[in-house]
Amino acid sequence: MAINLLPPQLANQIAAGEVVERPASVVKELLENSLDAGATTIDIDIDKGGAKLIRIRDNGCGISRDDLKLALARHATSKISTLDDLEAIMSMGFRGEALASISSVSRLTLTSRTASQEEAWQAYAEGRDMTVAVKPAAHPVGSTVEVLDLFYNTPARRKFLRTEKTEFGHIDEVVRRIALSRFDVSINLTHNGKRVRQYRAAKETHQHHRRLSAICGNHFVDQAMQLTWEHGDLAIKGWVEHPLAPVQGSEIQYCYVNGRMMRDRLINHAIRQAYEGYLQGEQQPSYVLYLTVDPHQVDVNVHPAKHEVRFHESRLVHDFIYQAVLSVLRQVTEDTLSLDEEDNGALTATTFPENRQVAGENVFSQPYQAPVTSSTQKKSTGAYQGSAGKGLTDTQKSPQKTLDTRQFGESYQRTQGMLYQKMMQESASDVENKEKIPLFPPRPPLNLVDVGHTTNNNETNVISVVPRSVNASAAQTDYTFGRVLAIYQQKYALIESSQGLGLLALEEADFLLKCAQLLPENENLKPQPLLVPLKVTLSKDEINTFKQFQALISDFGIVIDISHGKATIHAVSLPLRQQNLPELLTKLLAYLATEKLCSKQQIGHWLAKQLSHESGVWSQAQAVGLLADIERLCPQYVRQPSKNLLQLIELQPVVAALNNERSKNANKT
């Protein structure tokens, strides 16, 4: 068959199949257009569940006469004009498909007037003909879109519409979601001539709570806890349900990304994971959350309906949401948790405490906040200021100011958000100090010590190496290996420092770094939850081995449940996250099966070998990064390197030999 270019009418109807699923889809697209036009008042009239009439009227900026015809054309929009605009979308719409798709399956009338025009103009388009007729009309500044007889020309699509009550229920839900995203906009909804919803514009905090109560119910508002969290370009605020409150169901789950209502699995997973251990069975958390992300870091252009987004750094966003929600849950249950600690000696693994800095988890500090007193509670106005799409308030942007809070439950108080503050302060001070240290500063003399390891003598070394032992000052703290000059035999680094030249074994350095990450002093590795738990089928012998060494395995941040012969890996520590976890688990159990008695040190060394540099071939850039990590995380190995880690090169005999040869040649001539 020959390939033909589709006529515009058919192309629009195909596009309508993605954009216009039901009357609620039409309402969503038209409401978003009104918000993009800057409307502060929107009136919605529905007849017969939207199948007969959908009319949306706003007081936005309007559309000029010259643009009316283009407004109904496909791929015509005023919201983006360049590729750069597409990569940083802040408007609700941007495709230019909605009006064209809607008009191809209905009888559409668009009436609009701008402030600069003395009269309004009306455009009419109907079904497959797509002929747009423009004529004068009477209308205030703003726009009105009337959609009559939806799917009148596509009987198959019309048959799929549900009952009038069901279709209006979907429209009502869309309006509720839009109303929660823009507190500053007044929205009125009428069905069959009867006013059903009236959301007045909310400027004050108590008005925000009134709208929240009207949409989510008094029960949610009474039990909800305010959440405010910020880190760099990421910010989240809103309300989450008290973990000890009775769960009503999953119908109150509203999430917005840069003001856009969203149904994203990554966000839902992060929230559910934060509530893990607080809910039972099929219970679902209730929440209303507003996530603000740098528009360059989120891709909205995923689906025509714009229900989904794609984050450029999804793991970072997931961890940020997870820690923000978990921090609030911990604050309100800290009294209960402290009692559990006294009884059990430690928190359960399901709470997943913050990981240690050396492991490098995505951790986020909350701005410091003074403890809330009874007097400040009375003055606090808290809650969400302004519309969701307009970013943070001045108070929320300033880490030095106390964030306003509101007490929704009987005992909830917002306390100092310091779960990660100390850790982040230490990290910031490390960076600041590093900037002040010269690239290759003079270092204290190295004290080479023999730790009893054997070295590989198979490689031929053409450089004469003479170990040198010099006492180092114990008071020195700024230790560095020096500068990496070259890579020798693909696994040794030739380094230069104030003490001369040295040859460093990169494989040994990598092994020591992995051991330091896996075996931190005086603490166990903290588990970091997986985005999706992994299931591994185990034999009976492997299950018995796991049960025998379960306590030791959990010390490395590995959280596993055994059920019906299958292991479910829920969390691992960050050093292990990039590994093939099912394969690593079976290898670990096979290793432990051969050891009757196995210590934590032995397991740590075994894991370090599994994590070692895969290729065994090192580049100079990799060597520089490795030594920087060793100097930062394991200064003891820099202060007193073992003989199988570093050997200083004595150049004096080589220089003497060269001078001797030159003297001989000079005598001959």
Curated annotation (Swiss-Prot):
One of its GO terms (biological process) is mismatch repair. Keywords: DNA damage, DNA repair. Signal peptide: none annotated. GO terms for molecular function: ATP binding; ATP hydrolysis activity; ATP-dependent DNA damage sensor activity; mismatched DNA binding. Residues 361-409 are annotated as: Disordered. It comes from the Bacteria. The keyword DNA repair applies. GO terms for cellular component: mismatch repair complex. Residues 363-384, 393-402 have a biased composition (Polar residues). Belongs to the DNA mismatch repair MutL/HexB family. This protein is involved in the repair of mismatches in DNA. It is required for dam-dependent methyl-directed DNA mismatch repair. May act as a 'molecular matchmaker', a protein that promotes the formation of a stable complex between two or more DNA-binding proteins in an ATP-dependent manner without itself being part of a final effector complex. This is DNA mismatch repair protein MutL. It comes from Proteus mirabilis (strain HI4320). The gene is mutL.
